[in-house]
Amino acid sequence: MSRSSYIFTSESVSEGHPDKVCDRISDTIVDLFLGKDPEARVACETLTTTNQIVLAGEVRCAAPIDDAEIEAAAREAVRDIGYEQDGFHWETATLQNFLHEQSVHIAQGVDASGDKDEGAGDQGIMFGYASDETPQLMPAPITYSHQILKRMAELRKSGARPEFEPDAKSQVTMRYENGVPAGVTSVVVSTQHKDGLTQDDIRELVRPVVQDVLPEGWFPPEEEFYVNPTGTFVIGGPDGDAGLTGRKIIVDTYGGAAPHGGGAFSGKDPTKVDRSAAYACRWLAKNVVAAELAKRCTIQVSYAIGVSKPLSLYVDLHGTGRVDEAKLEDALRQLADLSPRGIRTRLQLNKPIYARTAAYGHFGRTPTEDGGFSWERTDLADELRSLL
C-alpha cells in the first residue's frame, strides 16, 4: 500500500556545477552538428578539471566541421556559464579534442536502408513521469530546487548579485499530506562566492531568492535553512572538482520521484533512444495527466539496438487513474509512433535545441516556437480523452 503522508527530498545543481559544465559543452557540440546536418550522429563526452577541457566520442556529419569550430563552440559555452576564474577560464583553458568518426558497425544497425526502418541506437529502458502537483506537471521538490538555482544564476548574470559565482547546489525537502505537497521542512543551498564574504553574508543573499521561489508560508524553520554549511566556498567549478558528462541524470529528470532507465541525455543526438525515448515517455505521461486521466503517470518503454519498434510499453497510474491501464497502453500505441524515427518526427528533435536542456532539468520547461522542449506540449490530451 502506498503512503499518503511522507517527507521527500530532491536536489538540483547549477549550470556552473562541474558535471553540468560538461553537459552544456556536450550538448553545444550536438547543436553544432545538428545545425549543419539534421541527420548528424553525435556522441560527445566531456571532461573538465583545472583549466582543462577534454572532448571524446563519435560523430558523423554530411557537412564539414573543423576542429576550430568545435573548440570555439565549447569555449563559448563555458563563457556563457560565466567562468573567468584563475583555475578555469573559458579563454585560456587547454582544450583537447578526441572526437572521431562513428563506428560503421553502430551505423549499420541504426541507419535505414531498403525496407529496413531506422533502428534504435542501443538497447535499454526509458521512463517518463508526470504528476499534477505543480502547474508544470512535475514533482514539487525538484521543481523548486531548479527554480532556486535558476534565479540565482539570473541574478549573477544580470549583475544584481555579483557575489555569486557559477557553481551551486540546492536541495528541497517537502512534506506531503494525502499525497499532496503541504510544506517545506528544509532547504539547503551551497553556492560558490567571491572571496571576502562570510557565511552569514551569503545566507542573507540567498534568503530572498528562496523566499521568492517557495509559496507563501512555506519557508522552512530558520534552523532548517542551510546555506554553505561547510563555510567558505570560493574554489569551485571544475577547479574544485572534475566534471563529466552524464553524471546528473536524476537532477535532469524527476529528482528521484520516478524510476530512471540509467542512460544520460546530454551529448547524444536524437537517434539515441536514451534521450529521445525518455523525452517521448515524458510527453506521453504529461498528456495522460493533462487529460485528467490520472493524477500521476509513469511510462516505461524498452528497445533493442537496430530494431525500430519498442519491445514493450508499460503504464502505471499509481492508483490514481480514471481509466484502465491496459486500455490506456493500447490507446498510446495507437496514437504515438514510438519508433526512433517516429519519435524524432513527431517531436521534431532533429534541430539544434539541446544546449538549453543542459541545466535546470529537461522536463517541466516551456515549449518554444523553434521546437525547444517540444516534449512538454500537451497536444495529445484531447485525442486521449476521445479514445478513452
UniProtKB/Swiss-Prot annotation:
Pathway per its UniProt entry is: Amino-acid biosynthesis; S-adenosyl-L-methionine biosynthesis; S-adenosyl-L-methionine from L-methionine: step 1/1
| Signal peptide start-end | none
Q: Which GO terms describe its biological process?
A: one-carbon metabolic process; S-adenosylmethionine biosynthetic process
| Positions of ATP binding | 17, 167-169, 241, 247-248, 264, 268
Q: Which InterPro entries match?
A: ADOMET_SYNTHASE_CS, S-AdoMet_synt_C, S-AdoMet_synt_central, S-AdoMet_synt_N, S-AdoMet_synthetase, S-AdoMet_synthetase_sfam
Q: How is the cofactor bound?
A: Binds 2 divalent ions per subunit. Binds 1 potassium ion per subunit.
Enzyme Commission identifier(s)? 2.5.1.6
- Spell out the reaction equation it catalyses: L-methionine + ATP + H2O = S-adenosyl-L-methionine + phosphate + diphosphate
Self-association or partners: how does it assemble? Homotetramer; dimer of dimers.
Protein name as it appears in the record = S-adenosylmethionine synthase
Which organism's genome codes for this protein?
Maricaulis maris (strain MCS10)
